[in-house]
């Protein structure tokens, strides 16, 4: 009988963006791959896809019906492994798999960044920490992507459960690679930028946590010192109008580009001079790693995810959250020192290779194998 795995997350785009290599790996192993998530995105390597309207808010009453749908799917298909991602998807899937787990289904959860962390609001600790502590009883393996979360997870895990740390979800270092000056210029022309523009790129959803406000304020401080500065936001989100209004208010509209969704994000990164990130909370910082893979120097806010990949002054710079002036100073420093840009970029590429897709697939294969090689299902309490 063919073995089956169910991947669950809040939205299906999460899988398209980050998990296709793992789907492919399971197919190569002869497994059936099923997906449960909100959305209509077509996903390769998937045998069954369940469009389940999981809500992002843990307080949305519709998630009760979602729980019932998920439980029906899990109980019907008798999965060997259920691997869940994202906070709400992870909660609902683990609750829905409790009965199946008693019959041998193994449940894995990847925390892409706990909402409770150093510096997080007290409400995050009061809400998310007790829930994760409770759910650890229904989790066979808790997987983390940064050191702070790994240490925290070891304190959460119940006897019999495993805690693992991997090098993120994997950067495609072939797609995100350095390009020649000629190719960079071609990409700039293709995407509507000038040859002499000094381009900073930040691919991220426009929201409060990604904190684009700090970058806009930094750009406003540099608008006269670096007239060719272009700060490019690749993404959409609820804060787009607010951030556009802020750029206008600070007189920086000519220097801030709201690019919107970009299907060729690797090209937007390759045409840039510097990779930037201003998030308050980050699990790892894939956008920073993608910039590093393309040999872009990185400037990012000092949080647990960015600290995992940036060594201040060696492969990039870390900036205190909220300190727009410090961000501006580092941008200006790189503008005036192209040799420093090259040095940081080369070191960044070395860092990105340690977080490559090939390495993380290998790490996850080791984790999965512990549950795939069982001849008979071992029942969980």
Curated annotation (Swiss-Prot):
Lineage: Bacteria, Bacillati, Bacillota, Bacilli, Bacillales
Family: Belongs to the glycosyltransferase group 1 family. Glycosyltransferase 4 subfamily.
Gene Ontology MF annotations: glycosyltransferase activity
Listed CDD domains: GT4_CapM-like
Protein known as: Putative glycosyltransferase EpsD
Organism, scientific name: Bacillus subtilis (strain 168)
Protein origin, superkingdom: Bacteria
Keyword terms: Exopolysaccharide synthesis, Glycosyltransferase, Transferase
EC number per UniProt: 2.4.-.-
Induction / repression: Repressed by SinR.
GO terms classed as biological process: polysaccharide biosynthetic process
Matches recorded under SUPFAM superfamilies: UDP-Glycosyltransferase/glycogen phosphorylase
UniProt xrefs under Pfam families: Glyco_transf_4, Glycos_transf_1
Function of the protein: May be involved in the production of the exopolysaccharide (EPS) component of the extracellular matrix during biofilm formation. EPS is responsible for the adhesion of chains of cells into bundles. Required for biofilm maintenance.
């Amino acid at each position: 009988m063919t073995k089956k795995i169910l991947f669950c997350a809040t939205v299906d785009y999460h899988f398209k963006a980050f998990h296709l290599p793992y789907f492919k790996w399971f197919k190569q192993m002869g497994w059936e791959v099923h997906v449960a998530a909100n959305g209509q995105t077509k996903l390769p390597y998937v045998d069954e896809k369940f469009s389940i309207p999981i809500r992002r808010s843990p307080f949305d009453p519709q998630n009760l019906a979602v729980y019932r749908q998920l439980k029906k799917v899990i109980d019907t298909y008798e999965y060997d492994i259920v691997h869940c991602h994202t906070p709400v998807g992870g909660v609902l899937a683990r609750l829905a798999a409790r009965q199946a787990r008693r019959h041998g289904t193994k449940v894995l959860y990847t925390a892409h960044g706990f909402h409770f962390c150093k510096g997080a609001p007290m409400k995050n600790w009061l809400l998310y920490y007790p829930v994760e502590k409770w759910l650890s009883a229904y989790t066979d393996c808790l997987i983390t992507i940064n050191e702070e979360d790994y240490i925290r997870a070891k304190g959460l895990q119940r006897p019999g459960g495993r805690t693992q740390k991997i090098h993120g979800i994997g950067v495609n270092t072939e797609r995100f690679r350095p390009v020649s000056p000629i190719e960079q210029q071609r990409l700039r022309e293709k995407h509507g930028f000038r040859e002499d523009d000094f381009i900073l790129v930040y691919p991220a959803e426009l929201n409060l946590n990604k904190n684009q406000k700090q970058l806009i304020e930094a750009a406003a401080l540099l608008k006269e010192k670096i007239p060719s500065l272009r700060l490019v936001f690749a993404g959409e989100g609820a804060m787009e109008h607010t951030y556009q209004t802020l750029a206008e208010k600070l007189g920086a509209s000519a220097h801030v580009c709201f690019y919107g969704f970009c299907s060729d994000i690797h090209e937007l990164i390759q045409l840039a001079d510097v990779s930037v990130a201003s998030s308050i909370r980050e699990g790892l910082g894939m956008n920073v790693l993608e910039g590093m893979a393309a040999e872009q120097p990185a400037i990012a806010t000092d949080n647990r995810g960015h600290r995992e990949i940036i060594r201040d002054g060696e492969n990039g710079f870390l900036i205190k959250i909220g300190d727009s002036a410090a961000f501006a100073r580092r941008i200006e420093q790189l503008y005036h020192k192209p040799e420093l840009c090259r040095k940081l970029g080369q070191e960044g590429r070395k860092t990105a290779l340690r977080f490559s897709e090939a390495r993380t697939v290998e790490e996850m294969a080791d984790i999965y194998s512990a549950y795939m090689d069982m001849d008979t299902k071992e029942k969980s309490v």
